[in-house]
Amino acid sequence: MEYRLTTPCTVQDLAPLKAGDTVLLSGVVYTARDQAHKRMMEALDKGETLPFDLEGSAIYYVGPTPERPGEVIGSAGPTTSGRMDAMSPRLLDLGNKIMIGKGKRDDAVKAAVVRNGAVYLAALGGAGALMAKSVQTMEVIAWPDLGCEAVRRLTVKDMPLTVILDAHGGDLYQSGPAAYLESR
C-alpha cells in the first residue's frame, strides 16, 4: 500500500502502516546523525531541552552535502542507521515517531518502535539527489560546528520512503527475504 503522511505524526497516523508499504512523507523532518545524537544524549543527561520537539517528530539520518547555487540542499542520501541504535530507544520513548535511514536496526530499537507505536522508514541509499528533490526548505537549527552533521529543519513534500519496521513488529528485512524464498 501507499500512504501519504504529514508530520508531526501520532500513533494513530502510523498504525495502518505495514513493513513493505510506501510512504510519501511531507512536513517537517529534522536531520541528525551520529554526533548530533551524542549531543542530544548529553543535553538530555543534563536536563536541557533539545533543539526541537520530539513529540511526533521525524528524524532523518543524513549529513547533506553543500547546496549548489539555486538549490535548497545538496545531495541528501541516508546514512547507516545502526550507528544511532544505542540512542534511538531513548528518543522514541520521549516521543520521536519516525526514524529515516538505511540498514538493519538492533532488537532494542525494534522493541522501542513497537512499544511507542513508531516506525522506521528507509530512504533509497545511493539516491541522494532524488531524496534532495523532496526538500523545499532547509535551516540549520543546532550545533552548526558539526558541519554536515548539524541539526537541520527540513520542510519536505512527498519524500519517497519504505516502511522497514512497523508498530506491530513487522520487519521488512526479515519478511522480504522470507517471502522471496517462499515464492521460489
Segments predicted by a language model, with ranges:
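Active-site/ligand-binding-proximal alpha/beta "capping" segment
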Residues: 88, 164-184
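Feature captures the catalytic cores and cofactor-binding loops of soluble hydro-lyases/lyases
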Residues: 31-32, 36-159
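Short, structured beta-strand/loop micro-motifs enriched in basic residues and often containing a Trp
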Residues: 1-9
